[in-house]
Amino acid sequence: MTHRFNHISFLTDYGTRDEFVGIVKCVVADIAPHVQVIDITHDIPAFDVRAGALALARAVAYVPKGVVLAVVDPGVGTARRSIAVSVSG
């Protein structure tokens, strides 16, 4: 079964001084041009997974139905665990 969503809510520790947020949004636009990307924040302190989780918890009540992409990366290229959650309702 294929799910089709119209929104991606986007939270990162990337900051906005460089091109990384823009690159992710360009890739999304290329893959799914119908999708609106909603920026929650990109100013989570670097590598601070707890701060990212707290920001997401505060925002989730306002996030529209769709996909939430949260990236707080403890180090590019390092061994780390990913989390994927599916919520219905």
Feature roles, as predicted:
Residues 1-89:
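Charge-biased, low-complexity intrinsically disordered regions
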